[in-house]
Amino acid sequence: MQGNLSAWLVKHGIVHRSLGFDYQGIETLQIKPEDWHSIAVILYVYGYNYLRSQCAYDVAPGGLLASVYHLTRIEYSLDQPEEVCIKVFAPRKNPRIPSIFWVWKSADFQERESYDMLGISYDNHPRLKRILMPESWIGWPLRKDYIAPNFYEIQDAH
């Protein structure tokens, strides 16, 4: 089943894949990493002016990593804001996705957290560095194939 946004994207020749609707009826679309930045700009111009959240997850051990964006179209004339969920999948070996910081500034810390926990590099992000873990931390703690070091070996003696 195709939603309003997916139909609009098809009408304008914008490549994407419809993933259907979630339990709240929010349309979910898959965008290729190489197309994401230009489509993000198009969505902003179309009216999706608010990035509600960005998160990332490990799809399966040894599989793809996903970056998920929840966008909202807020207009004064609309009683019910229109929402869409965008999923961008990246290969595990060298996960690179264009940053949307320059489109929605609120992506700043959210993309940094996804980098810190899963190792997804957001190209052209102005300050992409660890935000939760120490800079010296090795590995990506939320990957399903991550092997946690013994906690007592990594903490400093106090």
Swiss-Prot record:
GO terms for cellular component: chloroplast thylakoid membrane. Its EC number is 7.1.1.-. It is a peripheral membrane protein. One of its GO terms (biological process) is photosynthesis, light reaction. PROSITE patterns: COMPLEX1_30K. GO terms for molecular function: NADH dehydrogenase (ubiquinone) activity; quinone binding. Keywords: Chloroplast, Membrane, NAD, NADP, Plastid, Plastoquinone, Quinone, Thylakoid, Translocase, Transport. Gene3D superfamilies: NADH:ubiquinone oxidoreductase, 30kDa subunit. It is an enzyme of class 7 (translocase). The keyword Plastid applies. It is found in: Plastid, Chloroplast thylakoid membrane. It catalyses: a plastoquinone + NADH + (n+1) H(+)(in) = a plastoquinol + NAD(+) + n H(+)(out); a plastoquinone + NADPH + (n+1) H(+)(in) = a plastoquinol + NADP(+) + n H(+)(out). NCBIfam families: PRK12494.1. NDH is composed of at least 16 different subunits, 5 of which are encoded in the nucleus. NDH shuttles electrons from NAD(P)H:plastoquinone, via FMN and iron-sulfur (Fe-S) centers, to quinones in the photosynthetic chain and possibly in a chloroplast respiratory chain. The immediate electron acceptor for the enzyme in this species is believed to be plastoquinone. Couples the redox reaction to proton translocation, and thus conserves the redox energy in a proton gradient. Belongs to the complex I 30 kDa subunit family. This is NAD(P)H-quinone oxidoreductase subunit J, chloroplastic. It comes from Cicer arietinum (Chickpea).
